[in-house]
Amino acid sequence: MSRVYQERLASRSRLSDGCGSVPEPSPKLSIVVAAYCEKDNLQKLYEDLVEALTPLDVTWELILVDDGSTDEDTWNEIAALHCRDARVKGVRFSRNFGHQYGLFAGLSSARGQAVVTMDADLQHPPSAIPLLLREWDNGRKIVHTVRIDNGDTSWLKRTTSLAFYKLFSFLSGVDLSAGMSDFRLLDRRVVNELLQFREMGLFLRGLVHWVGYPSSKIEFQCQSRFAGTSKYNFRRMLRFAWTGITSFSTIPLRAGIIIGLLTSLVAFYQLGEALWLKCFTDRAVPGWASIIGLQSLLFGVLFILLGILGEYMARILEEVRGRPRFIVSETLGFPVDGSQPSPAGLASQYQGLN
């Protein structure tokens, strides 16, 4: 972005909407998209959204959250779209805080009576939004989407995803269907409820189910990524799954009691057998191999349980620290007079600059 363009954009951002127009009334629909190094997808995403929403004759806004992209091009693309269409608004994080926090920042600044969250890679098709709105018009406060695999997903990812959803539902009591994603519609009332949550470990898929309200599901055909590569590697997916489980269930902690009882029974059995052989028979007590093996098993179980306990203690430490969930370094298209919501001034848990 050239210096002249930056100065022109900065001067315009001092006005109400960032590009010189009068602040519009709250739209009926807000679309929230979290993007991390997605510069090649944003233009196509915007065009597809316009194509899908124009026939509906509905007022809308698009909130693009730059989740600390390592390139400048992503934010520059958001700025260009904003100056082309004032309905496009931008939120920029000071660093990468994570996809869930990006979506939450968008929810924090959305003004629509209905809010749709989706990904920037166009695997969530904008053409499905009219179906979401139809369900909302029929009284549904939450409209979930369930992904139909297009065949591009690897066997490993399908299997691990299915295993996670079944495990999560079993441990938490919150029923998540396999294939469920962050592509969903939320009524304003549901959004307001979500914004009251103060926990640091965000797992929106679980939280949306937890708040209740009438809901429905629609299926959509998962598209291939339009450009770029997925930023969600195996390590991130594993961390995401663990956050979801520990955010909604204490069963891993309680499982330690059961495992401890079972291993104690095994230990008592081994001890009783050794005493019986020593006192009532002429057979020699088995050698050190069995004893060391049993001790290794017990210590292994003990350290696993200590690790689980440590994870929960780390979660408690994060909550006690009271740090903001994310820091907003820059915004586009939001008022600076506080007359309407903006990511920079919603609550003390956020820190941002206009």
Residue spans for each PLM region:
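Residue-level detector of functionally special positions within alpha-helical transmembrane segments
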Residues: 37, 72-73, 187, 260, ...
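Hydrophobic helical membrane-anchoring modules
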Residues: 2-26, 150, 203-354
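Short, conserved catalytic or interaction motifs in soluble domains
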Residues: 95, 120-122, 188, 220, ...
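Acceptor/aglycone-binding surface of glycosyltransferases and processive sugar-polymer synthases
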Residues: 80, 89-95, 99-109, 126-204, ...
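Structured catalytic core of nucleotide-sugar glycosyltransferases
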Residues: 2-154
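Conserved amphipathic alpha-helical interaction elements at protein-protein interfaces in regulatory
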Residues: 51, 55, 80, 84, ...
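Residues in soluble alpha-helical coiled-coils and helical-bundle/repeat scaffolds
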Residues: 37-40, 123, 127, 195, ...
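Residue-level signature of catalytic and energy-coupling elements of molecular machines
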Residues: 49, 106, 121, 143, ...
